[in-house]
């Protein structure tokens, strides 16, 4: 494939459009003015937006506030009516190292969206809920779905517990399965071998 010379940042990096409405059917993608580092651990922030108007508001607030602060991000927002029924209709990708720095800004955005009825109550399973309709999780890496990874772990635990109707046994199998992957069942929002300080983030979020 021929790439215009103006689109080449270096031999391995291509400059793409910031707004990409056709990258994945049913979703709108926006990226920051600053390149998102792909080799560093990422965080995912899930937004339970209530519909098309909420999607427009979220895109406007995120792009304006984070670009003004020169923070790198990718934003994936549903543009299909069916997807708005999900609690992960919008996902914001950020560097883990900078999450605490952007926490106050993201909290203000969530407050605005909540006041205007743009956020539902629920958040995706396994995430750390930080506000109404807003959940956080560490990106598992490898370009895989966070929810899929956790669901597969839970499924293996169910299979390993067999047909047992004993809740403690099922819980034990779940704990063992998650621990085998280096993840605590009590903190499923963290990735394997995580060093992320979620208490620091929550403190910054609440300021």
Describe each PLM feature range.
Residues 1-207:
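Structured alpha/beta or helical-core interaction and ligand-binding surfaces enriched in interleaved
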